[in-house]
Amino acid sequence: MNIDLVLREAIQNAFQSVFELSIPLADVNLQPTRKEFEGTHTLIVFPFTTTCKVSPEVIANKIGDWMQTNTQAIASYNVVKGFLNLSIKDTIWLASFNQMYQNKHFGYLPSNRQKIVVEYSSPNTNKPLHLGHLRNNFLGHAVSEILQAAGYEVYKVNLVNDRGIHICKSMVAYQHWGRGETPESRGLKGDQLVGKYYVKFDQVYKEQVAALTQTLGDAEQAAKQAPLLQEAQVMLKQWEAGNEEVLALWRKMNGWVYDGFDITYQKLGITFDKVYYESQTYLLGKEVVAEGLAKGTFYKKQDGSVWIDLTQEGLDEKLLLRADGTSVYITQDLGTADLRYQDFKPNKLVYVVGNEQDYHFEVLAKIMARLGRPYATDLYHLSYGMVDLPTGKMKSREGTVVDADMLIDEMIETAEEHTRELGKIDGFSKEEAKDLYHILAMGALKYFLLRVDAKKRLLFDPQASIDFQGDTGPFIQYTHARIAAVLRKVQQADIAFNDIVEQENFVLHPLEREVIVELAAFPKKLQESALAYAPAILAQHVLEIAKAYNRMYAELSILHEQDTKVQLFRIQLSVLVAQVIKTVMHLLGIVVPERM
């Protein structure tokens, strides 16, 4: 039963009957009632004052009175400053609960036959994944799962940036200082070894620039003329020309990085339907540049570089191809956008990329529109803010960037400390305890990064993220484990709970009603989350469900309830809460334990 729809249709009928006013359902604005007022649904009546020619209070009272008299849904109503707050009868809530309980796929929406491609992760093969990548991966994975649950056909793709000047920098550094070492000989993950040489390049390059600046007296020229950078630029040209020696080194070092990435992705529970490699797609971008030149959409400067003038759109002139013919960052996006459209024919292409690239994706959409691409208006940049760490709370190998692997390991240690202190591993084997620490660590990390609006910059506090009493992943995970423990005791006591709860003469406790209200909102919250590409909506909602259940659990007995009808209902309510928690946490990429 869709209570929102029932109420909106009743309100539509009320306006027709009381004011002879025909209003579309879309104009019936129902919102959750604020906690300080009685009721669960609030009608905003201000938009109707002009048409009805009476005050909001009069409208609200007349509509409320009509609904209480003419429908079976309304137990009572109250009016606060022109807002109509509605309280629903317990029989309606119970009917809604029974439908939810019997639906093993409750909350999932039917197919809408819309295709969406979600691109996320997009790492560079010159360093390990870091804290910023974690927010990216968690957002991309969660958005994909949420869209799929909301009825979309979703394809998760990863574009690996495996070529370009930044890759050549680590290669040049390895040629100078690698001395043939391998991940095995150093006991390092491959991505960490390659990242070490990227850092080495940067250190030596800065030293060269400083020395040249003193000689030339011009820091800008020094930055361009530093020998190490010029070596990297030569190597990039050699790579694009197909130099076999350069390609062999590139394949070897990238192979190390991929092995390292695979380990990290496995820890994170991140998967993709298709992986693209820039080395295989960047030439497509050059083809698009050639097309744009032929059409007159792009233009070539005297030095041979290719540009587009977007000043009429309020932007600027954008470089598309360097004078030496090498690609820039946007070149490959031109080609891969076409390729994705050919591969999937999506209705929407979502890019999960940090907000430092906001301008880049605005430019990309304008270029595709100028080229007449049919999908130009269907490109969506899911922009997100940076993630910071409290000063001094997390070690860093380079002093500025935190490795994902290092953060995961420290989170697992923190989870172990908290879990042992609280005595939540009694009866666990060593392996079971180890699995639990990993589940809690990842739950803490993922939930903390997903619960906040993606656009906001985020301060990640490892200790706060794993607080079992806070607004955290482990609090929700513990709620699920608590329900699972109750249901095991129900099974041990051989209590039958499959019969449907009769609606007549059944009075809900306010705490039970709170739980049902939160559960009933799940399908709507899922849809809102999907439409806004906002996992934070669902993350907050599952927290409210867990809180409502814990309030009920603290006050009302389940196993020792004497009224068998009430006990039956509370057991079933517990089953549904566990089901919805497990479903939502799965959509967020989080595992919930059965025991703690």
Swiss-Prot record:
This is Arginine--tRNA ligase. The keyword Cytoplasm applies. Its EC number is 6.1.1.19. One of its GO terms (biological process) is arginyl-tRNA aminoacylation. It comes from the Bacteria. Gene3D superfamilies: Arginyl tRNA synthetase N-terminal domain, HUPs, Isoleucyl-tRNA Synthetase, Domain 1. GO terms for cellular component: cytoplasm. It holds the Pfam family DALR_1. A motif ('HIGH' region) lies at residues 123-133. Keywords: Aminoacyl-tRNA synthetase, ATP-binding, Cytoplasm, Ligase, Nucleotide-binding, Protein biosynthesis. The keyword ATP-binding applies.
